[in-house]
Amino acid sequence: ENGELLVPMRYFRDNALLGIQTIRLVDNEWSKKMLPGMRAKGAVLRIGPQRAAETFFCEGYATGLSIDTALRLLRLNAVVVVCFSATNLIHVAGGMTGKRFVFADNDVSLTGEKAALATGLPWCMSDVQGEDANDLHARAGVMAVAKLLTEVSRAEP
């Protein structure tokens, strides 16, 4: 009714609901908020198949949707794990096993890159500062995202 998108935030180990992130357009800017008092550490949103051969971690919901679109285009059996923040991405990636990759945000502050490096996993990001996978998708198309995913998934951990 008020145009809010509600994104469930579930604990990465047992899928218990920890809270909700609300996303809405306010004055032509996207506003993201978590419900007061909720625990964000370990919170994720999984997008894609339940049983996947590969896992791609990212920070934001829109970023995750763009990565999932590219993965489906590539016909990869992979799940996207949206971690909601760079700090939480490090925590969650360290607590999961299997073939894992990171699509980092290319922040001016280098926060996304530092988080990707801290995981020790193969990672990629847009070469344009200030962009995440969703920005890259909007600017250059889904194939630009797919190209980076293909390159990083061929990397040795």
Where are the regions that the model predicts?
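Basic, glycine-enriched DNA-binding surface that flanks or lies within the catalytic cores of DNA
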Residues: 1-55, 66-69, 73-74, 123
